[in-house]
Amino acid sequence: MRPSFLDAEVKRQRDLRLAQLIQQRDQPAALATLAFNALVYPPAHPYHRSATGDSASTAALDSATVRRFWERTVRPARTTVVVTGDISLTEARALLGRWLGAWRPASGDDAVTPPATNPPSQPAKVYLVDKPGAAQSVIRIGGPGVERSDSAYYTIEVMNTLLGGSFSSRLNTTLRETKGYTYGAGSGFSYRPLPGPFVAQASVRTDVTDSSLVEFFREFKLLRDSLVSPEELDRAKSYLALGLAGDFETTGQVAAQLNGLLTYNLPLNYYDQYVPRVMAVTAADVQRVARRLIVPAQYTIVIVGDVEKIRPGIERLGIAPVAVTTAPM
């Protein structure tokens, strides 16, 4: 736990990352995600920028900066070790004592995460990022979601499975199977210590960009306005319940699940409760959560595509004001 951060190695990794950032400029999906986060979250919010940095912040890195960050953030008092596999508690403690027993924090104070407030609600708006000649339009629709600690977590999971969280979801069935606009469409809540984004997304043919938006917003409205059928609800709940075992197939997966419990301060018997609580979700629960969290009138819509071809049709829809922007790089 005493990395040297040699100048040459830091420079090599920095230059590699800068090259990756340049490559992102040619990746519409990456541009859409960067633009979406920057537009949903205000500049002072930690989710406004990519966790992997941008060109300016990356170019400024040197070994002293990296070492200072390490010493302030990676400290014994802030560290939890998860061990899985064919090993006893006694053996694990002995190994940790051998390799980490002498670890002491560097001098100086711990890093302090500045407080952040939830982004304010704002009227829906469409932002276009120009990619001339693009055969497809990359669509991101959504806004701030919820914290992992939200009391309706299980209902949210069921609701999103219905909307866009599985292959048989409404968004994928409509946009892929029925309309043939895309190879896949979906949605999801990003659970984080602060409310991460809710995003519905797809990459669609350029000529059906406006038509795809119509279908997205139709599905949002349907989920809010109508009770889901018993058959569809049972299918979504079974999808989540039966999929749980697949999250524990390897020791790495077991460690990841335990780490999630620790990160979000969940009880160690959380997974004993998971299936019963998922199966207890009702159609009324789903509609109530949809009305609270699926709010199209406040959504940010980001589309990366050929602006000259897609803008007229989107403006004719009248779903929200339209502006052209760029993705932060």
Q: Positions of the model-derived regions?
A:
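A common structural junction motif
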Residues: 1-5, 99-107, 218-228, 317-327
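Short beta-strands and strand-coil junctions in structured, solvent-facing domains, enriched
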Residues: 2-7, 89-90, 102, 106, ...
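Non-catalytic beta-strand/loop surface segments
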Residues: 11, 23-77, 102-150, 161-211, ...
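Divalent metal-coordination and catalytic microenvironments
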Residues: 17, 66, 81, 141, ...
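Non-catalytic, conformational "gating/processing" segments within enzyme and secreted inhibitor domains
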Residues: 63-99, 297-300
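Short hydrophobic/aromatic beta-strand micro-patches
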Residues: 82-84, 201-203, 302-304
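Hydrophobic side chains in well-ordered alpha-helices
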Residues: 92-95, 171, 212, 289, ...
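Small-residue-rich helix-loop
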Residues: 221, 228, 234-241, 245
